[in-house]
Amino acid sequence: MABWDKVNSVWSAVEQNITAIGQNILLRLFEQYPESEDYFPKLKNKSLGELKDTADIKAQADTVLRALGNIVKKKGDHSQPVKALAATHITTHKIPPHYFTKITTIAVGVLSEMYPSEMNAQAQAAFSGAFKNICSDIEKEYKAANFQG
């Protein structure tokens, strides 16, 4: 089970630098999974160097991290924001659910690098548990929608 209080205590620091953290997460996602760029039309077909400081990646980074933050702040009682997030990613963006696991795993790594004192082993375990819980709930929504992407 996730330690939501631990996650939220670190998340308050994340919010102070949310766009830069989101940029690092997205850039790492594109570096590790280049095919993931296909799901971000404004960002695809650009090198990581070209993307680094564009307004488009900053806007997308802000959107992604704020959506994740809204779910994290629910401390596990997140069915409504998860349903809304899944619905848009199923119908509009058509992003396969395994990308949520990829991006949240990357997020734990990036946060650990950027906030080494806050992201000790206990915090990393708390984030991993919280993100696993969130991703599992998102996958349930995909299954319920019979996603075929």
From Swiss-Prot:
InterPro entries: Globin, Globin-like_sf, Myoglobin. GO terms for molecular function: heme binding; metal ion binding; nitrite reductase activity; oxygen binding; oxygen carrier activity; peroxidase activity. Heme b binds at residue 89. Keywords: Acetylation, Cytoplasm, Heme, Iron, Metal-binding, Muscle protein, Oxidoreductase, Oxygen transport, Transport. It comes from the Eukaryota. Its main location: cytoplasm. PROSITE patterns: GLOBIN (PS01033). It is found in: Cytoplasm, Sarcoplasm. It is an enzyme of class 1 (oxidoreductase). Signal peptide: none annotated. GO terms for cellular component: extracellular exosome; sarcoplasm. Its EC number is 1.7.-.-, 1.11.1.-. It catalyses: Fe(III)-heme b-[protein] + nitric oxide + H2O = Fe(II)-heme b-[protein] + nitrite + 2 H(+); H2O2 + AH2 = A + 2 H2O. One of its GO terms (biological process) is removal of superoxide radicals. The modification N-acetylalanine is found at residue 2. Residues 2-143 form the Globin domain. Monomeric heme protein which primary function is to store oxygen and facilitate its diffusion within muscle tissues. Reversibly binds oxygen through a pentacoordinated heme iron and enables its timely and efficient release as needed during periods of heightened demand. Depending on the oxidative conditions of tissues and cells, and in addition to its ability to bind oxygen, it also has a nitrite reductase activity whereby it regulates the production of bioactive nitric oxide. PANTHER family: MYOGLOBIN. Monomeric. Belongs to the globin family. This is Myoglobin. The lineage of its organism: Eukaryota, Metazoa, Chordata, Craniata, Vertebrata. The gene is mb.
